[in-house]
Amino acid sequence: MKRVNYLLCISLILFVVSCAENKEKISVVKDNNLEMQMIEAYREGIDEFNKGDIFFAAKKFNEVELLYPQSIWAPRSNLMAAYAYYSQLYFNDAIYELERFLNKYNNHPDTDYAYYLLAICHYNQIQNEKKDLGEIIKAREYLTKLVEEYPDTEFAEDAKYKLELIHEILASKELYLANYYLDREKWIPAINRYKKIVNEYDTTIFIEEALYRLVELNYKLGLEQEAKKYSVLLGYNYQSSEWYELSYNILNKKNQNT
C-alpha cells in the first residue's frame, strides 16, 4: 500500500537523521537511556517486519508506544503494528491495533488510512454472506465513513468501488432468503424479501429476477393488478430480459387458454 511504503520510508529517514545529525545530538541520545530503548525498539521492529517476523515486529512497535507514548513515534508505531498483522492476514489482531489507534490518536493525519485499513480487514473476512453479515456491515460502516468524511483522499475512490460490491452482496443475500421462502411456499415472507430488493437494491443485477418473482407470486395469490404493476416496471426497464418474457407469459396465460 502506498501510504505504508511512505510511512516506512519516512520512518527510516527520520531514524537515520535522529541518530546521525551531529555528534552533540548523539551524545544527548546516549545519555537518555529511555530514548535509546525507543529508537532501538523501532529499528528492530522495522528489521523484523522486513524479515517477515510480524509478531516480533508488532511487539517492538508496541514497545515504542510504551516507552514514548507522547512522542510522534507512538502513533506511527501503532499503525506499523497494525500493518504488520494485516500484511500476514492476521486481521483480528490488525483490527485491535487500528481500533486502539482511532481511540487514542483520532486527530492524527493518518486517521483516514487507519479507517481504510480497518475497512479492508473486515472486507477481506467476508466469506459467506448467507450466514454472517457481521463483517459486511462493519466494512460498509468504515467505507461509508471514508467516502463521507474523507472524500478527497486516495482511499475514497476504492471505498466507493467496494461499497458497490457490498451492495451487490447484500442484495444477493436478500434474493437467497426470498428464494428460500419461495421453495417452501411461504409466499408472504418471499414477497417481502423481493420487495426489499426492488426498494433498496434496484441498481443491482438481482432486480430483474425480484420483479419477475413479484409478478409470479402476486398472480398466484390472485392479485393480478399487483402482478401487472411489477410486470410493467420490468418491461419498461428490462424489455429484452428473459425475466420480462417469463412475466409476460404468466399474465397472458389466461388469454392463451381461452
Regions found by a protein language model. Give the residues of each.
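Acidic, polar-rich low-complexity tracts and alpha-helical solenoid repeat scaffolds
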Residues: 18-258
